[in-house]
Amino acid sequence: PAVLGLGDIGALSGKPVMEGKGLLFKIYAGIDVFDIEVNEKDPEKFIQAVKAIAPTFGGINLEDIKAPECFEIENRLKEELDIPVMHDDQHGTAIISSAGLLNALEVAGKKIENVRIVVNGAGASATSCTKLYVALGARKENILMLDSKGVITSDRPNLTESKKFFATDRRDVHTLEEAIKGADVFLGLSKGNVLTQDMVRSMADHPIVFALANPTPEISYEDAMAARPDVLMATGRSDFPNQINNVIGFPYIFRGALDTQAKAINEEMKIAQKV
């Protein structure tokens, strides 16, 4: 598992997160949820366990599964089951951050097809967010994605398929500091305190900063606002303004899927919900 910002803490330790998620399903969308923690790291065994209990349920929300295993698990279950399956860490985050991005671009007076985007993080949430940005009009050539080794370039060996999709042919940028110069948008789904005030100052006019690492953002709200007054800033935390949180996404997309007896949650549904 990959539980919030806590990493692999085990299935049992992740139970409070799952119980909380179930409560939010009930409060916001009236959906009764059973949280089931699966103590299994082998993707095939996990898939078979989920398939075995699937007849009991109207839909399955996958949670806190690390990349790249999460991609295989979700894709297989979507193909092999006839009920909606969604990995919330990927798509819930993508839907809500996309809605936030479109609003921020409107405030900044910019168009999604023209902006330069820097994505710090290459896990499940980061890649899913960025793919939805592309579906909404962002250009792949305007996107730089970084992992723990720096900017992901096409000449790097042993890239996963999700990283290959966003690998750049550029060879003039390697670090976050280099990548972010002149950028319009920063999306952080990585770790805390990696974005400095100087980096924010080096961005384009009216920069959009989504520092979504939990529990510590890539840069604090106060530091970003102090760096420059024109920044459009959001985090994943409820104690700062402009929170980007899956809770305004996942309950309702499942409510819609269940009410319409949909057999899957597709890209069109995700794009429709962000509006």
Could you say what each language-model-derived stretch is?
Residues 82-84, 115, 161-172, 231-236, ...:
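Short beta-alpha connecting loops at secondary-structure transitions
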Residues 88-89, 108, 211-275:
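Adenosine-phosphate binding glycine-rich loop
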Residues 3-29, 95-187:
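Glycine-rich phosphate/diphosphate-binding loop of Rossmann-like nucleotide-binding domains
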Residues 39, 86-95, 118-122, 238-240:
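Active-site nucleophile and cofactor-binding loops and adjacent substrate-binding regions
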